Amino acid sequence: MKKIFTTLLLAVITSFAIAQNATLKIKFVGATDQKVTIQLPLDVTRFYPNREEKSFDQDSTLVFSFKADKISLIFIKNSGKTFKFLVEPGQVSLQLKPKNKVEEAIIYQGANQDGQIALNKKNDTFYQYRASNYLKLDSTVNGLIALMDADKAKELQVFKTLLAQKKISQPFYTEVKNDIEMDYLATATAIPIQLFFDSERANSKVVFKPEFKEWWGKLYAAYPFTNLDDLRTAEFYYHAQYYSDYYKGMFLPQQNGTYIKPDYNDVNARLKVSYDGFAKNFSGKVREYLLASFLFNEILQEKYQPILLELLADFKKQYPNSKFYPSIKPGADKIIAYHESAKRDFAADQKFVANYAQINTLDELMAEFKGKTVFVDIWATWCGPCKAEFEYGEELEKFLKSKSADMLYISMDKDLADTQWKEMIKYYKLSGNHIRVNPKLLQNLMDKLWDGKGYSIPRYLIIKDGKLVIDKALRPSDKDKLYQQISAHL
């Protein structure tokens, strides 16, 4: 009898262990890229850097498993399209067509099938944009609350109906409901923030009315940052950051006369103020999550500030067993490597355009390259997408050299970033010719390439014999397509 009981107990334990995993079999149809990026939960939170890169096999199928003690939100990115699913423990068979509309792109065989489609169709407009749009519709607190409540109820009704029809589970509905409610809470608090900053601008005619000041405080008081379920929602980090940086860090001190404005030209000072704000204004697991998210987000900007190493060391000291730390550490290693490279001299093939500070127009700059075909990369030290393209620079450099073509990098940075500009040339090993714009050249580029009022980068050009032949060239990541485009002008 004892042996039978033991056998049954082992069977139950084994079954329970299996049930705590989710296994997905995904068939990709019409994908243009074999690479698949999967973002998984970490320590029951939505933590962006907890991602894995995989590739599907020859028949375009990918099978992977992950620990799933409860329903888990995962993201799957392929061929420029991101899908999200709330996956319960067990087996899931999935077909994805990245190039199709949502209704046709997903065939989900598993729990909450109809809910998965609705989840991918849900409005994901960034909450700050929503706040701006609501402000265009009404200028009173009560009016804005009514508008948002109506929209929130409409979004929730889709999933309430599915729940009533037993097409989604209660855990699925709860996760979606939490995310929608956080989205609208973040939107609501973003409205006073926008009015606060608009009223602070020089010569501003915007009045930050008392009713909005009162509403701002009431929102935070009614929804304190203590619910761990919020750590799985899309907007929680930014919602908490605005509370810490602007409500607690600026508005309240201004109200009671204790505000001391940091020197925001000192990036290190800004980072320290924000980090200390998170440390002071939150507690427990929420505090750990927010500090980790802050460090990752700032390291991700790839500005390589040394103070981030100090702050990460402090985080490690406070949370020696944090599950978030391993995802942040590789970024810290890049900061160390960056400052090591900054000590070195420029490579022989890293050259600066002669008297570049005196070049005021694109025509003057192009005249420096008569008789040459030149691929031009317009970038800046603060531009993440620009720096992401540097990954493909070595292959591009080989192609250009084989064709006796030149490379020109135009930095849109201001004088304050001069040192960092030169350091990044070394760190990213940017072989070719370099120039940083002065105010006149900046304006001339905006006039010629954009609308004269602003610009968007990265931007790529092709020059031949001192003349602009393509003003919107392909990116280095386009590889062969770009090489063909350049070859047409050799």
What is each of the regions a protein language model found here?
Residues 378-395:
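Conserved redox-active cysteine motifs that mediate thiol-disulfide chemistry
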Residues 430, 439-487:
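Thiol/disulfide oxidoreductase modules built on the thioredoxin-like
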Residues 372-374, 378-382, 414:
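Short pre-active-site segment immediately N-terminal to redox-active cysteine/selenocysteine motifs
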Residues 20-175, 179, 187-188, 227:
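A non-transmembrane, solvent-exposed segment enriched in polar/low-complexity residues
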Residues 398-442, 450:
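Conserved segment of the thioredoxin-like fold in thiol-based oxidoreductases
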Residues 296-372, 423:
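N-proximal helix/coil linker or "cap" segments that precede and/or mark the start of modular domains
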Residues 1-26, 489-490:
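Bacterial Sec-dependent N-terminal signal peptides
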Residues 142, 146-273, 277, 281:
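N-terminal, charged low-complexity regulatory/assembly segments
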